Design a protein with these regions (language model features):
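A residue-level marker of the well-folded mature domains of exported/periplasmic proteins
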Residues: 92, 130-131, 153-157
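Acidic, polar ligand-binding/catalytic clefts
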Residues: 1-60, 118-141
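Short, charged, surface-exposed secondary-structure boundary motifs
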Residues: 28-32, 78-79, 102-104, 123-124, ...
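Extended ligand-binding regions for polar small-molecule ligands
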Residues: 49-55, 59-62, 71-73, 119-120, ...
């Protein structure tokens, strides 16, 4: 499921549990009718650049930088907030599917690729020349990730929560 499709699939009953890189946020918890049952991983958003770009830190970003990411994600919002906080004018390039983001970045359509750092590490392996890319050291967010269920089914919520707890212990 794409980031755009995931919540509809869960709320419609197409799936019973969403277990992927979905950040637990107040608005998602309160507004969409979802219940986050716990956290199984804390990630953080970062940036990947080409090693030959001369960029070694987010402090090296300049006005006009283009940044690829997934649409409909906290990553997209964090990216906007980050660049605005640094007064950097940037060109957002957003795609629905992660593979589209990877292909666009790999083809040179954007200067940087941003998502959770675990995702950057994994997606880097899909590049045509993975060793030509690096993840910058800065982390611009803290992302609590874990399974999500529809609100209103306390028994199923308990099953998923205790399954998660068992795996963590």
């Amino acid at each position: 499921l794409s980031a755009k499709e995931r919540f509809t699939a869960l709320t419609s009953g197409e799936i019973d549990v969403l277990a992927r890189n979905t950040t637990w946020t107040l608005s998602r918890d309160a507004d969409i009718g979802l219940t986050f049952v716990g956290v199984n991983f804390y990630d953080g958003q970062g940036f990947m650049v080409r090693k030959n770009s001369g960029i070694n830190s987010v402090n090296d970003f300049k006005n006009g930088i283009s940044a690829c990411t997934n649409t409909g994600t906290t990553t997209e919002l964090n990216m906007r907030d980050f660049f605005n906080s640094k007064n950097i004018k940037y060109e957002p390039i957003a795609f629905e599917k992660a593979d589209e983001v990877v292909q666009a970045y790999d083809a040179g359509r954007c200067d940087t690729y941003t998502t959770d750092k675990s995702g950057l590490a994994a997606q880097r392996t899909k590049m045509s020349n993975p060793d030509e890319h690096k993840v910058l050291p800065e982390t611009i967010s803290k992302e609590p990730l874990g399974p999500v269920v529809r609100q209103g089914d306390a028994v199923w919520e308990d099953i998923v929560r205790w399954s998660l707890n068992t795996m963590i212990e």
